[in-house]
Structure formats: structure tokens, C-alpha cells
Amino acid sequence: MADYQGKNVVIIGLGLTGLSCVDFFLARGVTPRVMDTRMTPPGLDKLPEAVERHTGSLNDEWLMAADLIVASPGIAQAHPSLSAAADAGIEIVGDIELFCREAQAPIVAITGSNGKSTVTTLVGEMAKAAGVNVGVGGNIGLPALMLLDAECELYVLELSSFQLETTSSLQAVAATILNVTEDHMDRYPFGLQQYRAAKLRIYENAKVCVVNADDALTMPIRGADERCVSFGVNMGDYHLNHQQGETWLRVKGEKVLNVKEMKLSGQHNYTNALAALALADAAGLPRASSLKALTTFTGLPHRFEVVLEHNGVRWINDSKATNVGSTEAALNGLQVDGTLHLLLGGDGKSADFSPLARYLNGDNVRLYCFGRDGAQLAALRPEVAEQTETMEQAMRLLAPRVQLGDMVLLSPACASLDQFKNFEQRGNEFARLAKELG
């Protein structure tokens, strides 16, 4: 465990994670300073009076006087103020690094462009089914530092590329990169390989690396080695097996579960299940309890969630599809009896939308594109696309057109922040309108 006594600690960014960092240091007899570029950041009213705070901008004087800077994942390491501090030899970490220095129980670490919240939650459910005292959080749910507990037997952490950038002490019992597709390109000016490099940090010092056999970008730089186990649709140690019209999860040639026993549906969710099973096996969880968890787990909100099935029409909320890869996963192998009414739009974060084009062929697809990058998305197939300013306008446009066998799918391939507070608000608004219009 690290000793922070006598250190001048500065925390950048409040919110729940920032507050967890403040509490962490106060519990160790260190009073940090806090700054946030927002004038009234969330959690400001919960800061103890003894903690100095600076809001509305970064305070370079504080930063250059610090011994340790704990930076929110929301601030880029390339920010001039952080670059200057790094050049001056000041240590810059994030909350995950603080956590890794303290955690006494094994850690399962999960990252990827898509599916990581589902897999993280699922591994947590597998641990609970085995009677293990487990802490689940990180980039979802509770911040990692709030999970620290002497009685915890296993930690399962979802980690973003931003969090991994400032983490160097992670030694996971099992770590995975589920997939790598373009995301946050506004934060990675050198492109996909720079983004991938941040993700690859998760494998450093990992006991087992769980890689995606269908995605070479998830492999360690030196390629697969004896630490690696793989999952995939048709390839990998953990893969899908199709026989006589049925689909099975299979591990090294052995059929372990028929997917019809699972409440999750869709090929992308079956591969999520394989990844979770590989991680649970690597962490030493009993296979039987892991399989039991797979039969009871219903999935997470806003992730290919059926919010209404009425008059033979399914309305599906996939608002968590905030990038192209996630929407590709939703469309890959999608079965629709009638017409697919696909809602796309929002802030594309400088992504290339062209990989979606191959899923939009055929006579049974209609596109409804909205938000900041609606025009770019409509250009994928203009003859079947309509553009509106808002998602609500798009839904009111399509509602009179839906018929028996149709599907209305919100899988926007974009962030929501141009028109919504977050993807949850967007998904809730879709669900509300579906129930009104369906």
C-alpha cells in the first residue's frame, strides 16, 4: 500500500469519482485540494469545508506545486496544464491506480468499445451465484475506491481507455479487451491505434488475457501467448456451435449451454456470455454457478432492450449504442419479418460511419436520422433515409407507417450529448414515446 503522508495532492474533477478520491485521502490523513473546470460541478455541496476548491477552470499554480495529481478520466492527458505538470516530473494518476495500489483481492478487468458493462455485470452475477463476496464497479455503478473492503473476495471492474491511460499497477487475475472499434476519436488524434494502445494497458501483468478471436486488435502487441484464452463466434476456446437449428455455448469442444436457456438474445450477447464465462473460469469461479447465472441474467437497460411489443411491432431501445461498432453488433444477424425502422443520430465523435452501409441494403430498411450528424448518416443510403432535427420528430414520422412484423430500433451509433443529458435520458425518451405511439 502506498504512503501519501505529507504529500501535496490535487484532485481534478468532482462528481462521484472525485468525491471518492477526496474520501480516500481524508481517510489516510491527507487533505487534498480539488479543482473542476465546471463552475458548479456535481458533488460540490458535499465537499468537506476543510478541502480547498477551485472551480470554473484549472488552477495551474496548484498543479505545478503538487506532488501527486489525481486526474478525472474526463480530462485528456494531452491537456496543456497536465502536459506541463508531467514535463515537470509530477506524478499523474487516476482513481483506478489508487485502487490497484490498495486492493487485496483478485481483480477481473474488462474493457472494450462495446459490451463491457454487460460482461462486467454478468461476471459479477456469476461470482454472486457462487457465493463470493464481490465488488462490481469502476466505469459503471460505484467508483472503484468505494468498493475497497477488507472482506471483499473478488473485484470485477469495467475500465475505459481513459482510466487505463493513468493506471500502471493493475495486476488482474483475468483481463479482457472485448473488441476495438472507432470511438472517442475526438480524444485520440492519432487514430485507432492510439485508442487501442490505451486499451492494451489492461493486459500488463495480467495472469490470463481473454482475447476476441474475431478481432485481431484485441490481441496483445506481441500476439497471443500462453497467457491467452480466446472467445469468438465460430473460433476460439469459447465459441458458438450451431447444430440442427439450435445454438450452443461451447468450451474447447464441449457444449455447455443451449442459448435458448438464456434470457439474453442476439449474437452479440451470446459472445458477451462467452467472454464472461472465460473470465469467470480464469478467476476460478465454479463453472456450474456461472452457467446458472447465464440462465437468469436479463441484461441491462438501454442495451437492445425490448421496451414495447404491441400489434406485432417490436420497439427496441439500444441507446447505449454510442458508436458505430455497437450499432454494427446490433444489426449483425438481425432477423426482422417486416421492415426495420432504424433511428440513427446524435454526435458521432468524428467517427467514420461507412462500416454501417453493408447492413442497410435490401427493401426492408428505412432510416430516420436526427441530431448533429444526421445528414452524414442519411447519406449512407439517401433513397430510404429521412432527416429530422430531433428523435421525437423522427418517431412521430415513422409511427403511422409501422405494420405487423416490423421493428423500430433506436441504435444511434452516436453519443447523445448534442440533445440529451446522457444515453439513459435518450433511451428513456425513446421508451416513453414508444409507449405513446405504439
Curated annotation (Swiss-Prot):
Catalytic class of the enzyme: ligase
Residue runs in coiled coils: none
Family: Belongs to the MurCDEF family.
Pathway annotation from the record: Cell wall biogenesis; peptidoglycan biosynthesis
Locations listed in the record: Cytoplasm
GO molecular function terms listed in the Swiss-Prot or TrEMBL record: ATP binding; UDP-N-acetylmuramoylalanine-D-glutamate ligase activity
NCBIfam families membership: murD (TIGR01087)
Enzyme Commission code: 6.3.2.9
Binding site for ATP: 112-118
Catalytic activity field: UDP-N-acetyl-alpha-D-muramoyl-L-alanine + D-glutamate + ATP = UDP-N-acetyl-alpha-D-muramoyl-L-alanyl-D-glutamate + ADP + phosphate + H(+)
UniProt xrefs under SUPFAM superfamilies: MurCD N-terminal domain (SSF51984), MurD-like peptide ligases, catalytic domain (SSF53623), MurD-like peptide ligases, peptide-binding domain (SSF53244)
Key word Cytoplasm present: yes
Protein name: UDP-N-acetylmuramoylalanine--D-glutamate ligase
Top-rank taxon, per record: Bacteria
Cellular component per GO, a single term: cytoplasm
Keywords assigned: ATP-binding, Cell cycle, Cell division, Cell shape, Cell wall biogenesis/degradation, Cytoplasm, Ligase, Nucleotide-binding, Peptidoglycan synthesis
An individual GO BP term: cell wall organization
UniProt xrefs under Gene3D superfamilies: Mur ligase, C-terminal domain, Mur-like, catalytic domain, NAD(P)-binding Rossmann-like Domain
Job description of the protein: Cell wall formation. Catalyzes the addition of glutamate to the nucleotide precursor UDP-N-acetylmuramoyl-L-alanine (UMA).
